[in-house]
Amino acid sequence: MEVNILAFSATALLILFPTALLLILYVKTVSQNN
């Protein structure tokens, strides 16, 4: 089964971008509380 690179990368970006934003916001709030 051939994997569609465009579909795979698009899905990966859709998953990674919101996760990265949430991690950055979480780290910022945690560092501010300390």
Curated annotation (Swiss-Prot):
Signal peptide: none annotated. GO terms for cellular component: photosystem II; plastid membrane; thylakoid membrane. It is a single-pass membrane protein. One of its GO terms (biological process) is photosynthesis, light reaction. Its main location: plastid. It is found in: Plastid membrane. Keywords: Membrane, Photosynthesis, Photosystem II, Plastid, Reaction center, Transmembrane, Transmembrane helix. The keyword Transmembrane applies. The chain crosses the membrane at residues 5-25. PANTHER family: PHOTOSYSTEM II REACTION CENTER PROTEIN M (PTHR35774:SF1). NCBIfam families: PS_II_psbM. PSII is composed of 1 copy each of membrane proteins PsbA, PsbB, PsbC, PsbD, PsbE, PsbF, PsbH, PsbI, PsbJ, PsbK, PsbL, PsbM, PsbT, PsbX, PsbY, PsbZ, Psb30/Ycf12, at least 3 peripheral proteins of the oxygen-evolving complex and a large number of cofactors. It forms dimeric complexes. Belongs to the PsbM family. One of the components of the core complex of photosystem II (PSII). PSII is a light-driven water:plastoquinone oxidoreductase that uses light energy to abstract electrons from H(2)O, generating O(2) and a proton gradient subsequently used for ATP formation. It consists of a core antenna complex that captures photons, and an electron transfer chain that converts photonic excitation into a charge separation. This subunit is found at the monomer-monomer interface. This is Photosystem II reaction center protein M. It comes from Cuscuta gronovii (Common dodder).
